[in-house]
Amino acid sequence: MGEVAGGAAPGPPRSGLVSIIIGAEDEDFENELEANSEDQNSQFQSLEQVKRRPAHLMALLQHVALQFEPGPLLCCLHADMLSSLGPKEAKKAFLDFYHSFLEKTAVLRVPVPPSVAFELDRTRPDLISEDVQRRFIQEVVQSQQAAVSRQLEDFRSKRLMGMTPWEQELSLLEPWIGKDRGNYEARERHVAERLLSHLEETQHTISTDEEKSAAVVTAISLYMRHLGVRTKSGDKKSGRNFFRKKVMGNRRSDEPPKTKKGLSSILDPARWNRGEPSAPDCRHLKVEADAEKPGPADRKGGLGMSSRDRTVGTPGQDNPGVSLHPLSTDSVDSREPGVDTPQEPGDTPPQGPTSLEPLAPPESTEDNGETESPEPGDDGEPGRSGLELEPEEPPGWRELVPPDTLLSLPKSQVKRQEVISELLVTEAAHVRMLRVLHDLFYQPMADGGFFPLDELQNIFPSLDELIEVHSLFLDRLMKRRQESGYLIEEIGDVLLARFDGAEGSWFQKISSRFCSRQSFALEQLKAKQRKEPRFCAFVQEAESRPRCRRLQLKDMIPTEMQRLTKYPLLLQSIGQNTEESTERGKVELAAECCREILHHVNQAVRDMEDLLRLKDYQRRLDLTHLRQSSDPMLSEFKNLDITKKKLVHEGPLTWRVTKDKAIEVHVLLLDDLLLLLQRQDERLLLKSHSRTLTPTPDGKTMLRPVLRLTSAMTREVATDHKAFYVIFTWDQEAQIYELVAQTSSERKNWCNLITETAGSLKVPAPASRLKPRPSPSSIREPLLSSSENGTGGAEMAPADARTERLLNDLLPFCRPGPEGQLAATALQKVLSLKQILLSTEEDSGAGPPRDGDGVPGGRAPGPVHTQEIEENLLSLEVAIRQLEELEEEFCRLRPLLSQLGGTLSPNLAAPERSAQTGLS
């Protein structure tokens, strides 16, 4: 078995480790075995020791891949690789780490701590901050340490018995240990390279699952590249789903030279995330041969750089014949993969390829300036060639502008034209991508009957409208460019026509509809591929078409969202390099409209994700306990439908019912409710709990799991920096819930959100009450025509008009439900506190309290009494707060009643006196 797996028969341990065969009858067997064990496994005592030795690590990885689940070990190694990246690269690499090891459908998924799994389920990984990402990685790695330690221990024990691979290769490194470090490291890498090459050739022996075998080999190859080992599979398509790190000095020998296409390091596979192949597309290689000649000289000249050197696009997409010039660092620096995302909260694009849009589409080239040759594989789609970029579009504005004019342009104008050129070319690429999505996927899915038409339209909503809108915008840009002779002076009106006014509102509506359903679409398509082999084969066949440019369907769906994030940056850069004030104002206004559209779309995406999450919770919600309960306060929640609510926040908390009883709950903060859900398998239970309290008549009180926020308030627990109280009033009865968060910052966040949500449900402020409202008569009486009413509104007597106005002002104070007994309730709480304090005095056996004693008897109350005192004080605080609010309302009500008294008859003035008496 070892010979097949390792490529060399393990055989007996090498000379120098066990010099002779020792029989079990030898009396020194155990002592010599222990000595040899320590010497032989000195390189494998811990993962920290072995992970910097490529050859030894290859032996360990080979053993683990054949004997164990390799996910934990590879997860720890890739986490170590991620920690060596810079902040920007690490944030982007976390997405690939998530999709490789943490995602539920990942081939190499590892056990994830519940706290991390919950956060990842409720938050898109690309929206997680860098600090939280690092914390998640640390927690995941810590949870894998036990499994990795067991694998190391097994390897060490098997190595003593000569059952581990690559022993002969490792023995060649022994003489060099402790001598020349540089020479030793070079030999380590050389041996590791040969071992890795053999592993790639025999990867089918790792697992019967070909996908898993390929994923394991790819993960190992990527980490070997991180250690400086040259690999053969570093550029293969199987390398997707793993982040890449550029290894200087070891990469170029195995890769085709990047200057072959005139592209800068922005298209280096190390700069891109999963799902994006790095090998160049050779379909238009011949066309680009002439365009690439001045590339090196242009790169030296800065502004003379070839446009393809700085194009932001997707690896694997060619850019024939389109000259796209670089942007300065103060405009859109396309050298950084993450610049295409506006630096605004919530504007991070959803998971998917890092690039915001593909490269420029095929257009007219130097070899053929009038017609565009169809792409290979598009023969079966007649009439579609015109859907690509119009053949009249020239290869680049620099090549058509007279040299004298080009030299006379100021630097800012050159930058401006470059950004406008990028806007045009990338818009053409986006239109091409949308049409590919429509022609190769949407329409064949409809024709093939894979989905019902209404369901398919829900997966690709408003796709036709988006193609029409973007095509119209592209036509306007092309027309303006041709009219201006490739030096566009005014573009603000074209931008405003697209992003402002009615056109902007329509664009916002259809883009919100499409983007908000992309998560739903990806889940539906993934589920369909798992269940139906015919659909899976159809998708794979469509993705193999040349028009897809080796992009997968899951990479194409997020392109609209990614395109929206590009607009604000491009328009902002155009505005910064526009000197004429009127034109600059138009461009900046268009950029602001783009930001508003993007903000609206992001909010629509979040709302849709919240709705899908609520639907999942509603499906798992178990209302059995509520329906069986006789509590009248819970009767209205027996058919609770949370999908009609708005999700504000959610998370795990600990509910301290009593001092000795704590329950782990998942809390949902909705727009008007707080739900305390208990997990039981896949179900979510809403269950009440009882708590014994001395002051209550029956000795018990029920704590309900559904809480209305109209009377909610929060207080932090002074003795626990993670705990807080949520206080509610149920029918003049205050209930106190003690909840514990995982951190103090989470406690603060929960308190703020509950307070803000409850505050939005309170009675409107006095200023808002002065807004015009329907008159009381219009609420109580059906609408009457002027003929039925006798006179029109203009003929109303002045006194009646004044009465109507005063009644309109009084309307906000008309609320259902009794407000009395507040003072009596507060007094009852005071008496309860007094009773507790007196009972504390009796228990202590002391005499009557003296003046100045803080506590009766001079002693502090016990824990039970302390909790009762605290709860009664909080209840008293609620009652006092309600009394203060009532007093404020009465102060505002009194002058209105006085004014109304002058216009009403004496028999109508009586309610004023009764109201004053009742409120006082």
From Swiss-Prot:
Q: Which residues carry this modification: Phosphotyrosine?
A: 737
- Key words of the record: Coiled coil, Cytoplasm, GTPase activation, Guanine-nucleotide releasing factor, Membrane, Phosphoprotein
GO molecular-function annotation terms? G protein-coupled receptor binding; GTPase activator activity; guanyl-nucleotide exchange factor activity
| All residue ranges annotated as the DH domain in the record | 415-604
What are the GO cellular component annotations?
A: cytosol; plasma membrane
User: One biological-process term from Gene Ontology?
Assistant: Rho-activating G protein-coupled receptor signaling pathway
This one is known as Rho guanine nucleotide exchange factor 1
Q: What is the lineage of its organism?
A: Eukaryota, Metazoa, Chordata, Craniata, Vertebrata
Gene encoding it? Arhgef1
